[in-house]
Amino acid sequence: MKKIGFLFDLDGTLIDSTAAVMNSWITMANEAGIPLKALAGHHGIPAAQTIRNVIPDREEAEIQKWIRRVTDLEIADLDGVHAVPGALELLAELNDREIPWTIVTSCTTDLAIARTRAGKIPMPANSVTFDQVTRGKPFPEPFILGAERLGLPTSICWAIEDAPGGVTSAKDAGCTVAGVLTTHSREELPHADHHLEHLNQLLGKAGL
């Protein structure tokens, strides 16, 4: 069998959490006095990095306050969070065929656990979350760590991502990247090696 591993982003790739994410961030932004337009383009980037990007001039204690606030809001709001079509079937097939995979997410561990449970997505013990890396997406460390946890070089790992920051992270880590067109268009993910209209296309693209 072809030696390969799969590294899946979570939000927008395996689960649809769009409504919950938007509700949480709109609430936090209104409370913090952050213009909503300042948050544009940050999908897929860890909350802590996003908040530092949009309010860099505020005191550290206040930055930490809003990081905690939006994380708490996201953990509490799981309404409508569900698996992306084809996700459960794909992961079941990978398990049946003993093809290694894990999750590489910008969520904190607590948020990832909450969302995978809500979406009924299995969360492997070797998943990579934001609080396990020093620099999250768009930096390459999350996918490098994900490949290490699979015991594979990044050169034979496929990363499945829906956001530009995640694509950049995976490409810079040395992975082959499949951009799933759930939250962004093909034109918005120009650096992905492949594009997927549906997760059921992944194994064929990978030659499996």
How would you name each of these model-derived features?
Residues 1-4, 92-95, 108-208:
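Asp-based, Mg2+/Mn2+-dependent phosphohydrolase catalytic module
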Residues 2-97, 110-113, 121:
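N-terminal helical cap/lid subdomain that shapes the substrate entry/recognition surface
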Residues 15, 37, 80, 102, ...:
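A generic secondary-structure micro-motif detector
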Residues 16-17, 43, 103-104, 161, ...:
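Small/polar loops that bind or transfer phosphate-bearing groups
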Residues 100-102, 176:
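Proline-centered loop/turn at the N-terminus of a beta-strand
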